[in-house]
Regions:
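Helix-to-loop junction immediately C-terminal to a conserved catalytic motif
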Residues: 53
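Conserved ABC ATPase "signature" region
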Residues: 114-132
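Conserved ABC ATPase signature
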Residues: 137-141, 145
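Conserved ABC transporter NBD signature motif
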Residues: 61-70
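ABC ATPase NBD coupling module
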Residues: 70-84
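The feature captures the beta-strand-to-loop junction immediately N-terminal to the Walker
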Residues: 38-40
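Short coil-to-helix segment of the ABC ATPase nucleotide-binding domain corresponding to the Q-loop/switch region
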Residues: 96-103
């Protein structure tokens, strides 16, 4: 999976004038790689993530998934089949159990109920969630467990692209480390394209490619050195 941004800009109406949140960004993201994006509040990070998720369309330029521009795609299908977003607040359905939350994208695709449940349970186990927790509601789980359920849902969906918005923001150091290691595994072993927006330098440093948003522009790329 290749995601190409071609002179992408996004503007919106401010109180007194139009505001440019993303300014003429050109970049190519590849599968098998973990990227981090840092930047100050208001630098355009979250807007860029929304553009990549198909939640917004560029005001100028285009974003293409394997050469197919998003403006010509069914963006609901894009989010259902290609892109998963992991949020800082987990974004789990409060009245669904852990396994039901993981099953949700599979049920949207009308996959066989028993097969969907089996896959959901396998992905929860892959994330270190004990079987006795599969039927717990989100408010019965710790923050780290809820984030692992959210990642299990992205895994079960089979998404090629994982967008993570401050995925460790509410977690302690131990859970943060586990989440980062999981994202690395998704990129390196399962060949997903993983893009992480973070304010944590340690999380950013764990990425293969480190990027920075400043005044709507994507800058300061650093490639990790091979050991």
């Amino acid at each position: 999976m290749t995601i190409e941004l071609r002179d992408v800009s996004y503007t919106y109406a401010g109180k007194y004038q139009r505001v440019t949140a993303v300014d003429t960004v050109s970049y190519t993201f590849q599968s098998g790689t973990m990227y981090s994006i840092m930047g100050a509040s208001g630098s355009g990070k979250s807007t860029l993530l929304s553009l990549l998720a198909g939640l917004k369309l560029p005001t100028e330029g285009e974003i293409a998934f394997d050469e197919q521009p998003t403006r010509f795609m069914d963006r609901s299908a894009l989010r259902r089949d290609t892109v998963s977003v992991i949020y800082q607040d987990f974004n789990l359905f409060p009245l669904l159990t852990a396994e039901e939350n993981v099953c949700y994208p599979l049920r949207l695709r009308k996959e066989d109920k028993d097969q969907a449940l089996a896959l959901a349970r396998q992905r929860l186990a892959d994330m270190g969630i004990r079987e006795s927790y599969f039927r717990k509601l989100p408010n019965q789980l710790s923050g780290g467990e809820q984030q692992r359920v959210a990642i299990a849902r992205a895994l079960a969906a089979g998404s090629y692209v994982i967008l993570a918005d401050e995925p460790t923001g509410n977690l302690d150091s131990g859970n943060s480390r586990m989440i980062v290691e999981t994202l690395q595994r998704l990129a390196h072993q399962e060949k997903r394209c993983v893009i992480v927006v973070t304010h944590d330098p340690a999380v950013a440093a764990a990425a293969d490619v480190q990027l920075r948003m400043q005044d709507g522009r994507l800058t300061q790329e650093e490639q990790q050195e091979e050991a």
